[in-house]
Amino acid sequence: MSVQSITESNQPPVICLMGPTASGKTALAMALKDALPCDIVSVDSALIYRDMDIGTAKPTKSELVQYPHRLIDLRDASESYSAADFCRDALVEIAEIRSNGRIPLLVGGTMMYFKSLIEGISPLPTANPEIRQAIEAEALSKGWQAMHDQLAEIDPVSAERIHPNDPQRITRALEVYRLTSNTLTQLTQIKGAKLAGDVLQLAITPRERSTLHERIALRYQQMIDLGFEQEVIKLKSRDDLHQDLPSIRCVGYRQMWQHLEGEFDHDEMIFRGVCATRQLAKRQLTWLRNWPDLHWLTTDDKTNLAQVLSLLEAKH
């Protein structure tokens, strides 16, 4: 069956290309874009930020001209972006791509985004600062154990899961109840809109863990050489950014920020940045090893493109 017949026979399939950081996802996505009538959609919680290009390994401006990516540069570094935000935006992009008879190619390493899109996400309310302040004030007066006891009365299932010494999660569970009159347990059993139609799920990673570690270290040094420090200096010069923001908590940015604060020297920053990136890759691989219906590809395997085309044809 030809590539043309894949897009014409039914609703075009969605390709999900996942993998740990530095595994070669972008290179394979570009090869697929050359071979297929597809549009790339980024699935990366770091690439959504503007002015954070080097430390996120965002494709270069020239690459983006040739291989446009949707869902990048959506937010300022001072703003947040949730899995629910991603699902909403991704479903719109996917519908538009499919309506043009093209294949949506979702590429990235933010596994929670993929999971939320494929399985649907619970319709939880956004944070409410006033209610949070009220809960925190009550906790200051009564103590967090009393707040946990309060949670146990209205939502025993959540209280069983949440430790009494976890104020952030206690606050969220109480906040959800006060906002909706439904418990967190009730709402998480409801799933929202999710990806429909044919989905081909792929994961790419090197055969050996040591190879992935080498690629991570090499890429981190390349980021330094490209001016990563200057990128973070520019971000740090802003009055509205700080270490607790999701953008600055991105791997690499946190370590560079701490270095610029004088917490450790340049060599230690590189060491910590590489270690944090390795830990991220390990978490990503843990997600993927438990992922159903996944086809594995090996980094730098010359047959990857042919394998994907064959899998697509087998689906139709």
UniProtKB/Swiss-Prot annotation:
Its cofactor is Mg(2+). SUPFAM superfamilies: P-loop containing nucleoside triphosphate hydrolases. Keywords: ATP-binding, Magnesium, Nucleotide-binding, Transferase, tRNA processing. Substrate binds at T21, A22, S23, G24, K25, T26. Pfam families: IPPT (PF01715). It catalyses: adenosine(37) in tRNA + dimethylallyl diphosphate = N(6)-dimethylallyladenosine(37) in tRNA + diphosphate. GO terms for biological process: tRNA modification. GO terms for molecular function: ATP binding; tRNA dimethylallyltransferase activity. The keyword Transmembrane helix does not apply. It is an enzyme of class 2 (transferase). Catalyzes the transfer of a dimethylallyl group onto the adenine at position 37 in tRNAs that read codons beginning with uridine, leading to the formation of N6-(dimethylallyl)adenosine (i(6)A). This is tRNA dimethylallyltransferase. The gene is miaA.
